[in-house]
Amino acid sequence: MGKIESNERVILNVGGTRHETYRSTLKTLPGTRLALLASSEPQGDCLTAAGDKLQPLPPPLSPPPRPPPLSPVPSGCFEGGAGNCSSHGGNGGNGGSDHPGGGREFFFDRHPGVFAYVLNYYRTGKLHCPADVCGPLFEEELAFWGIDETDVEPCCWMTYRQHRDAEEALDIFETPDLIGGDPGDDEDLAAKRLGIEDAAGLGGPDGKSGRWRKLQPRMWALFEDPYSSRAARFIAFASLFFILVSITTFCLETHEAFNIVKNKTEPVINGTSPVLQYEIETDPALTYVEGVCVVWFTFEFLVRIVFSPNKLEFIKNLLNIIDFVAILPFYLEVGLSGLSSKAAKDVLGFLRVVRFVRILRIFKLTRHFVGLRVLGHTLRASTNEFLLLIIFLALGVLIFATMIYYAERVGAQPNDPSASEHTQFKNIPIGFWWAVVTMTTLGYGDMYPQTWSGMLVGALCALAGVLTIAMPVPVIVNNFGMYYSLAMAKQKLPRKRKKHIPPAPLASSPTFCKTELNMACNSTQSDTCLGKENRLLEHNRSVLSGDDSTGSEPPLSPPERLPIRRSSTRDKNRRGETCFLLTTGDYTCASDGGIRKGYEKSRSLNNIAGLAGNALRLSPVTSPYNSPCPLRRSRSPIPSIL
């Protein structure tokens, strides 16, 4: 019993922290990296597939002799399914070492703190998220170990989702262009940021397309991004100045001091008394000022639409539509001012009404002030809260308008059946206005109850309004605070031109290799192995098949080979780079093979019946250990860093 228990124990050294558990514990989550590691170890309790049911293989009749050792496999390419698991001394090719305590030890160069939660998931069936670990790091570790993120417990789901909410909020606010670094990369970065790198690449090698490729992003950034250069800041200040002048002019046009009353009375032929007609004209000085502003806005609009990287998106933008609608009436008004027909006067009257669109230019200030952008994003993010507030108000208005109508009719006189003499609430629709004014605590005083029952309803209406409005407001305020803090944090983010790349390993490093292929193989983040493993395949295969007579069990037939569930959601673009101990001719990989990333289906201990799904099937090999279980290996979803 002691020997069986020692063989069942396994030690996992993750980032220098040793964890000890049993193989049966690791097998509780089939299809994950540790389950593949536990299943790949040669043992007498290996499983075989008999139809759709997994059955244990019978124990060997007699202890087989110990086979010759396999050649060591470089770290990062382990046949037992450990990903970048490295062994402490070879022992039967299992990638682990016999520990003095009786277990086998495997090393993973991963985050030790997160692995404690991962291993606890195997033990208890409940996956919790550590509060002191950044969300992307925990997500990356879950992907490496092949665990569904949807298995996170509901109590920790908000903690796990916080980083995604923050990333989505940060993506909303555009950061200024990075300053410094290699000047040769400016054009490529600008083209990539503006989304025109593909179009620029198709321009051809001629000089015209080359000049356009250089000019387009510069001109677009000059009028679109105030932080791209000093000239862009000057353009932004000029645009801001003309916006403020235009709005000021629009407001002053309504003042009596700038309105000139002209007599437009026309003589009436064959008439006795002509009708006096007066028109109000705006001071010509304000008209000239507005004309200068419109000329600037026209120039800015034309430049932006010409150098826009995406004309369709430019036209669909709401601010650009407002800009165009605010510019067009001025030119139509100038063109029709010389006409005296009735139709022209009607059109001019309509255009004067459309002038109010100019006030919407104030929203163009959102390009220059972060607070206004934060306010806009807060309003969009709080749509559900605003909808909830409207529903609450609508319910309250309907209820209290009905109550005030009947409450005021209680004291009506017998000779006044409509109660119109002693109350202003003659019908329920009139009570809607009173209920809205009361619930929003405005209290104009134009309508008020006059009976004791009506006063009681009015008091209840005011209290309900205060409570109703106060409930969604904190959520909206919290959204504004979150967006504003994230916007400030992104503005203060250190400006980096290039991502840090770790240096190549030194000659004294255990992962040092002489070729680039082996460097990728020995990386702690890599599963690609294309180098010297080819020289070990024939040797290992010959060792595994050299003593076929020692095994008491026949090799598995193809239908009986053990399937291993894999998912199509993990790293589809690297299917052809997986490194197995056997060559590609010795196995058949399903078209959707890969460690599942865990975005499609939740998996827990209650809904796992065994290994199912698409299979990775290996050729039958009879082992001297009398166990026909094939060697299996999963690949890491994390690409190589070297």
UniProtKB/Swiss-Prot annotation:
GO terms for molecular function: delayed rectifier potassium channel activity; metal ion binding; transmembrane transporter binding; voltage-gated monoatomic ion channel activity involved in regulation of presynaptic membrane potential; voltage-gated potassium channel activity. It is a multi-pass membrane protein. Zn(2+) binds at residues 128, 134, 155-156. Disruption phenotype: Mice are healthy, grow normally, are fertile and show no evidence of severe sensory or motor abnormalities. Show increased seizure susceptibility and reduced long-range synchronization of gamma oscillations over distance in the neocortex. Thalamocortical neurons show a strong attenuation in maximal peak firing rates, with larger spikes and slower action potential repolarization. Neocortical GABAergic interneurons display broader spikes and sustain lower trains of high-frequency spikes without accommodation or spike doublets in rapid succession. Residues 45-98, 542-576 are annotated as: Disordered. Pfam families: BTB_2, Ion_trans. Phosphorylated by PKA in cortical synaptosomes. cAMP-dependent phosphorylation inhibits channel activity. Histamine H2 receptor- and PKA-induced phosphorylation extends action potential spike duration, reduces action potential spike amplitude, sustains maximum firing frequency in hippocampal interneurons; also reduces the incidence of high-frequency oscillations in hippocampal CA3 pyramidal cell layers. Residues 1-233, 308-317, 373-385, 478-642 are cytoplasmic. Inhibited by millimolar levels of tetraethylammonium (TEA). Contrary to other channels, inhibited only by millimolar levels of 4-aminopyridine (4-AP). Inhibited by Stichodactyla helianthus peptide ShK. This is Voltage-gated potassium channel KCNC2. It comes from Mus musculus. The gene is Kcnc2.
